[in-house]
Amino acid sequence: MQRFANKIAVVTGGGRGIGQEIARALAAEGAKVAVVSRSESSCGKAAEEINADFPGSCTAYAVDVADHAAVQELSKKIGDEIGAVNILVNNAGVTRDGLLMRMKEEDWDTVLDTNLKGAFNTVKAFMRPLMKAEDPRIINIASVVGIIGNAGQANYSASKAGLIGFTKAVARELSGRQVTCNAVAPGFIKTDMTDELTDAQKNAVVGNIPLGSFGETKDIAAMVAFLASKEARYITGQVFAVDGGMTM
Ligand SMILES: NC(=O)c1ccc[n+]([C@@H]2O[C@H](COP(=O)([O-])OP(=O)(O)OC[C@H]3O[C@@H](n4cnc5c(N)ncnc54)[C@H](OP(=O)(O)O)[C@@H]3O)[C@@H](O)[C@H]2O)c1
């Protein structure tokens, strides 16, 4: 079944990890996908890899989502080059971990600017086409730490909690146009981001996951694809934890 035939999607942070898997899942079911990431090499490589399996599905765009003007320009470019967007996935995210006592102002600003302001920038830039689109969807990738917090991640937890509040406000504001807006809150997923953890930290984390292991990027992509589908039309303003039971 091609759930996304004739659909156009934008996936930020699509160059690696969870975002690349989301782009692949949407492309596999017929979507044309704009793969957006910070560096040209990363989004270019991701698009090339997905195009090898699903020819012509992906176009790469190197843009910093924290840059408001650049995201406005990106929206225009995607509109001209691919078409009007139906699905926006805000997945770009960074960490700058450290205990609050040692956290620098720039660590706070970088994380909030990317993870939270980045979503504000893209929703502002793409909301007009979304409001006119068929089956319009916004899906924000939050985190379980935006729900339960995490020592050493005050900046990241605040950005993800903010993203959850933003999700609910956007869901209410755009509901009249049938645009749904939901958040997915991953637990610990195997990507470059979690590769930074030491083995001792990984073991401690796994001890707190009822299902007993880190998740895979496919676990998140499957949830995003469902929320992006026609079948999810009556779901909005919700947060779905995909976390092996961590937050139950
Ligand atoms: N992995 C986990 O366990 C986990 C858990 C909970 C939530 N999440 C969230 O899931 C999302 C994806 O995580 P991941 O683990 O796949 O991360 P990742 O492997 O570190 O990849 C992050 C992606 O975001 C892009 N990105 C970062 N800053 C950007 C910016 N300013 N503008 C545009 N793109 C930017 C990166 O671009 P480049 O490739 O060009 O550098 C990269 O493609 C993030 O929002 C993260 O917070 C992850």
What are these regions (language model features)?
Residues I8, G15-G17:
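Conserved glycine-rich cofactor-binding loop
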Residues E40-S41, A62-L74, E105, D219:
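The beta1-alpha1 cofactor-binding region of Rossmann-like NAD(H)/NADP(H)-dependent oxidoreductases
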Residues L99-L100, K104-L112, T194, V205:
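Substrate-binding pocket helix/loop in short-chain dehydrogenase/reductase
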Residues V123, S159, T167:
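Active-site helix of classical SDR
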Residues R128, R172-G176, R233:
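Alpha-helical segment proximal to the catalytic Tyr-Lys
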Residues D135, S213-V242, T247:
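C-terminal substrate-recognition "lid" of short-chain dehydrogenase/reductases
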Residues S143:
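Residue(s) in the substrate-gating loop at a strand-loop-helix junction
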